[in-house]
Amino acid sequence: MSLCRYLDEQGQPQYALYRPGAICPLKNLTDEPPADGQIFSFDAARLASLQPTDEAQWISEPSHLLPVVGQPGKVICIGLNYRDHAIETGAEIPSEPVVFSKFNTTLVGHGDSIRLPAVSSEVDYEAELVVVIGKKAKHVSAAAAMDHVFGFTCGHDVSARDWQKGRPGGQWLLGKTFDTFAPTGPCIVTSSEVSDPSNLRVRMRLNGEVVQDSTTAQLIFDIPSLIEHLTKIVTLLPGDLIFTGTPPGVGAARNPPVFLQPGDECEVEIEGVGTLVNRCIADQ
């Protein structure tokens, strides 16, 4: 099942079934649709019961969708988690996950703009598979980790390299957390629909050209290992997001470097999950 968030006619966030080009609002399928943020309380059987009976229940996909989770408690990101990306950067293969975070103000949805800040001239792209947590998790083993995953979405870990690496002491948080620097979407694909998240093709297109192309088989720390590691430290809650890392081909590693410019269009495509599209504009 693929689920998205959108604004209804009254300007209220709602959930809908998603397919490219169309959505089916859940409020058309049940008298008790989940309130915003409450989709994670629906078990698999209840979700499976939400099936349209008439093609007329589908409506045209809005030009902009909301972030797949409105106000996650945590937006956790993993750095240098693809072997081929670590090699490209000249970094040592990490012995444990490199963890950082983003603020909620980074979150935008499919079709929204990425605002390029005036204080950075080195804004880079990073296509990522994002895990959406569905059940509270603390001290969870890798063997049980996937029981706590609601689903997956496409993410874009936009990064200001001149802040991330060029400021005194390095400023990973600031370089990663400018407003609009975490597009997600267009939808959450529930975990039951993704048979093998450890072998999904991940691509980034910049203005139609493929600039990143790898698979999650290159992950140094797979999703169960990440959840096991993180839950030794923090409690993961429904709606928390985990950006799992990016493949090689980032702009900073190119010769000459390639950084995002106003008018650029970024497409994150993940096999079996979807395609997230955002255009860059200058921040005002």
Regions inferred by a protein language model and the residue ranges of each:
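N-terminal non-catalytic cap/leader segment that marks the start of a structured domain
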Residues: 1-97, 267
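A generic local secondary-structure boundary/capping motif
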Residues: 4, 65-67, 88-90, 114-123, ...
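Catalytic-pocket segment enriched in acidic/His residues
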Residues: 5, 58-60, 85, 91, ...
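Residue-level "contact hotspot" at macromolecular interaction interfaces
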Residues: 68, 122-124, 235, 259-260
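Structural signature of FAD isoalloxazine-binding scaffolds in flavoprotein oxidoreductases
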Residues: 93-110, 125, 261-272
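RNA pseudouridine synthases
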Residues: 130-136, 140-155, 161
